[in-house]
Design a protein with these regions (language model features):
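N-terminal membrane topogenic signal
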Residues: 6-15, 135-141
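Membrane-helix boundary elements
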Residues: 21-45
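Short, amphipathic, aromatic/basic-enriched membrane-interface segments that mark the entry/exit
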Residues: 9-16, 72-80
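Membrane-helix interface/capping segments
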Residues: 60-76
Length: 160
């Protein structure tokens, strides 16, 4: 396997992990926040405060410009951390105050993350790179992207 094949494989792995692990977990948290009883909602709000503080700390300190999840590369969503912090903060405030639509801030976070993922990888030409018929796993990633798009579209419609 040459360096280009390794880069493509890493890119495919990153895309797969983002879509099927990160987004799935975040969508589930939004769904759970919608489904949980109003009396338990404040507990989720306090948890979201911890996450919000983490986003703010990481952004201000610059401590996570690169990471293992991008195989040592630049973390492209670093500039979105203040927005993630804001959305988690809004969720926390509303959840702690037992406002039933608080989950919508988490759903918005998932949606914004997914949109920015597609924008970033389109601008960078990454979808073109991974959809090269000469690469043996190109069709697998294309199927994964197509499937994930429809799954997440369904999740967003369902929780909205």
């Amino acid at each position: 396997m040459d360096a280009n094949d390794k880069e493509i494989e890493n890119l495919q792995t990153r895309i797969f992990l983002f879509l099927f692990v990160c987004i799935t977990i975040r969508a589930y948290i939004a769904y759970y926040a919608k489904s949980v009883s109003i009396d338990k909602l404040p507990y989720l709000g306090y948890g979201a405060l911890v996450i919000m503080i983490g986003f703010i700390y990481i952004y201000i300190s610059g401590s996570r410009k690169t990471g293992a999840e991008v195989f040592g590369g630049k973390i492209w969503w670093d500039g979105l951390r203040p927005l993630h912090a804001l959305l988690y903060g809004l969720f926390a405030y509303h959840a702690i105050n037992k406002i039933d639509y608080s989950w919508k801030f988490l759903a918005a976070d998932v949606y914004i993350g997914l949109i920015n993922f597609f924008i970033y990888h389109t601008i960078e030409g990454n979808f073109t790179k991974i959809y090269n018929p000469s690469h043996r796993v190109s069709s697998n990633i294309l199927i994964s992207l197509s499937l994930s798009f429809f799954i997440y579209l369904g999740i967003i419609i369902f929780i909205s």
